[in-house]
Amino acid sequence: MFCLNTFKSRWPREFQNLKKKKKKTCVKLSIPIRSVTGDAASLTVVVTMYKRDDYVRNKPGGVFSRWQGFARSMLLPKPFSETAELRRTVADYSLISRGLAPKILREAKGNREDLRVGKDFVGSRYRVQESIQGLGVAVNIHDADDISHGQTESIRTRLRSYGRPVPLLKKLGDNASQTITQKKTGGRSKDKKHGFEEERDVSRVEAEENNTNSVHASVLRLSRSRPQPVLERHDDIVDGSDSASVCGVLQEDGTTCLTAPVTGRKRCTEHKGQRITCAPPVKNPPCEEETEEICGVILPEMVRCRSKPVSGRKRCEDHKGMRVNAFFFLLNPTERDKILKEDKSKPKTRTSSTNQEEPGESLICEATTKNGLPCTRSAPNGSKRCWQHKDETVDQKSSENVQTSTTVCGVKLHNGSVCEKTPVKGRKRCQEHKGMRITS
């Protein structure tokens, strides 16, 4: 028992109150009283002291005391004529709600006696159908042409309704009810069904107006910064639905030109005088040799070099300073003679297509010039030399002279050998390898 009392003092205050609920305390006070005659008497007074939890708690709602009478009277099942409290609080409500009344009340019918038509109460979960006319001071009743009806929950629909024309609003005024839909915390199924029917009616009327093309109002498109007015005609151009507002010419990539035509014409300035299905003629691509920029040096395999030349030059980095047919004459004379003998030993019965495809394999003059270089002219059919070296004999010792020379060019050839030609006077390389370096 001792341990229980010690732990009881440590418990929180809420648990102590749950364990033992204290009753109210009565205090008796005896006050001595002396009468006029001088006799002594005593007056006993019993004072009842309640605990804090016994008092009636009031929430801090004293600020809203003016509104209590108005709200209570609106929720009571009594007509307006029998509610004196409502008539008394109308003046206070009008002074307070000058700016709030136009948002709550709209198109008041003036029926004061029957306030709750259709059993629609005033509250956070119901809607107001009819209200008192002139309940707030300076309540501006908007004109029927300027009021947005129907879908009040949708911000996009509310913004679009500002541009509706008069005939559309008149149709909406006949069909839609003059109601304001409040935010429902626990709405009923009937209210939801009624709201959906109103939305369907409004959307149906808008679709009919747009189909007849009688409405050319501007549409407000929402953006992150601010709404911007965009014409419906501009939307039609983007979508391509209106064929008269676009050029419509079929382009090369298969798409349709969506540019607006020139005033008074059917086409834009770019497609002036063209038909819709008329595509511009496609030019035949030129030959590969004309379009491609390649090095072009004939390699020992009789194939052109396809590498791109260095900017500002005709050859690539590997064939710098070389002519197109340089490799054919840079070979050793013995190997050159072998190639010529092989060409002679091949049968001459070739098709015309083969001769057209391989024009570079025609015979070359076998003579050697005075500076030791082979002649680059082509020999006519049936002869071994060109017209200049036709009467000269073949210099058999030209190769030996090149090999026995003390100074040679030294440039490494494509087949792995070294150029053994004598360089030009005052230079380190021969005429064919002018400006080239020796690659290790």
From Swiss-Prot:
* Alphabetical keyword list: DNA-binding, Nucleus, Repeat, Transcription, Transcription regulation
- Quick check: keyword Cell division in the entry? no
Q: Where is the GIY-YIG domain?
A: 131-167
For this record, an example GO cellular component is: nucleus
Q: Where do the record's region annotations for Disordered lie?
A: 172-216, 339-363
**Could you state one GO biological process linked to this protein?**
regulation of DNA-templated transcription
InterPro entries tied to this protein: Effector_transcript
**Annotated Cx9Cx9RCx2HK repeat ranges:** 247-272, 295-320, 365-390, 409-434
Its Gene Ontology molecular function terms?
DNA binding
Localization recorded for this chain is:
Nucleus
State where composition is biased (Basic and acidic residues). Answer: 194-207
Q: Where is the composition biased (Polar residues)?
A: 175-184
PANTHER family xref list: PROTEIN EFFECTOR OF TRANSCRIPTION 1, PROTEIN EFFECTOR OF TRANSCRIPTION 2-RELATED
The record's note on its domains: Contains a bacterial GIY-YIG-like domain.
Other remarks on record? Plants over-expressing ET display dwarfism due to short internodes, late flowering, reduced germination rate, increased anthocyanin content and reduced xylem lignification.
Q: What does this protein do?
A: Transcription regulator that negatively modulates gibberellin-mediated developmental processes. May act as transcriptional repressor of giberellin controlled genes. Binds DNA without sequence preference.
Name listed for the protein in its UniProt record:
Protein EFFECTOR OF TRANSCRIPTION
Native species of this protein?
A: Brassica napus (Rape)
UniProt gene name: ET
